Amino acid sequence: MVEQRGLTEQFEIASAATSTEEIWNGKGNPIYPPAQAELKKHGIGKTAYTNFAGKRARQVTKEDYHHYDYLLCADTNNIRNTERITGADTEGKIHLLLDYADELQEGSQLQTKNKSSNSISQTISRRGKSIADPWYSGDFTQTWNDVVAGCKGFLNYLKNVHKI
């Protein structure tokens, strides 16, 4: 998204784990093959900016807190672990990614039926929600959709607040 919008010079984007589960003897694992397949399906990895061939897992550090303006987390466990590793979030940098996502819109709304069988659409807020974890569901597409929604919302937030 950043590359598509011509904003690569304004961003430094990194990914880091909050645990060492994917790091063995000081070396991180590469991106999980089904996750790589999902990324490739959406054209990620085709450019120098999005190339993830050499990407390996690493754990977030205290230095990351001072280096980056925002630390965006997939779930509340990640927030707790990030705060434990980096110290107190005194600058308000640590957030849930989906807190920036728009509410679920037409076509992805929850559909329910009332007792008279009339369909009712309900808009659902994503604020405070976790990104779908494919480790448990195997659904990398839902995870992709959640991450995209959060990233789009975050870019819109930066556009409105920081005028990027």
Where are the regions a protein language model picked out?
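A short linear-motif detector with a strong N-terminal bias
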Residues: 50-52, 73-76
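Phosphate-binding/catalytic loops
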Residues: 70, 76-164
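A structural signal for well-ordered alpha-helical scaffolds and beta->alpha junctions
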Residues: 28-32, 75, 151
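Conserved active-site segments centered on acidic
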Residues: 1-68, 158-164
